[in-house]
Curated annotation (Swiss-Prot):
Gene, per the UniProt record: orn
Transferase is among the record's keywords: no
Family per record: Belongs to the oligoribonuclease family.
Xref: SMART domains: EXOIII
Lineage top rank: taxon: Bacteria
Residue ranges annotated for the Exonuclease domain, each copy included: 8-171
Source organism of this protein record: Vibrio vulnificus (strain YJ016)
Descriptive protein name: Oligoribonuclease
Main location: cytoplasm
Function of the protein: 3'-to-5' exoribonuclease specific for small oligoribonucleotides.
Keywords, ordered alphabetically: Cytoplasm, Exonuclease, Hydrolase, Nuclease
EC number: 3.1.15.-
GO function terms (MF aspect): 3'-5'-RNA exonuclease activity; nucleic acid binding
Length: 181
């Protein structure tokens, strides 16, 4: 175990839609890496129970994707509340990273942070205000050097833990190809 203020916290959420004022979080996962992007630990992967009324707010894409992955079934069978998910996730993070020092890391992580701010403010407050958003590098690469993108592809399962692993792998790819480190 390596508690360090240099460790990075990676988070991914799956939601019932894109509007944090309307939609809910249905899955959360976290991973802690060291500063070299080596995975140190995987946190709890939690399907968060939501009512049928909340699940009915999903659009066709969300319904098809989250049903096809088995997530909707896991959400329906879950007893985990949003607050329990916060508590379990923070209990995991406290073993690896001090509060307030790690940027929030992931792909399109600003969207996840909006949901955390609205639905899990205690967890959102665990992060530094900065972001490490892998999608920023992807968007810049797509515009400035699109050939590089042919060297990396994602499975796109839209399951939180898989998405984090892919985000870490994608950042490692950019580190090697763009930054040559």
């Amino acid at each position: 175990m390596s508690f360090s203020d240099q460790n990075l916290i990676w988070i991914d959420l799956e939601m019932t839609g894109l509007d944090p004022d309307v939609h809910k979080i249905i899955e959360i996962a976290s991973i802690v890496t060291d500063s070299e992007l080596n995975i140190l630990a995987e946190g709890p992967v939690l399907a968060i129970h939501q009512s049928e009324e909340e699940l009915a707010k999903m659009d066709e894409w969300c319904t098809n994707t989250h049903t096809g992955s088995g997530l909707v079934e896991r959400v329906r069978g879950s007893q985990i509340t949003e607050q329990e998910a916060v508590e379990q996730t923070i209990a995991f993070l406290e073993k690896w990273v001090p509060k307030g020092v790690s940027p929030i890391c992931g792909n399109s992580i600003g969207q996840d942070r909006r949901f955390l701010y609205r639905h899990m403010p205690e967890l959102e407050g665990y992060f530094h205000y900065r972001y490490i958003d892998v999608s920023t590098l992807k968007e810049l690469t797509r515009r400035w050097n699109p050939e590089v993108l042919k060297g990396f592809s994602k499975q796109g399962t839209h399951l939180a833990l898989d998405d984090i692993r892919e985000s870490i792998a994608e950042l490692k790819f950019y580190r090697q190809t763009i930054f040559k480190i």
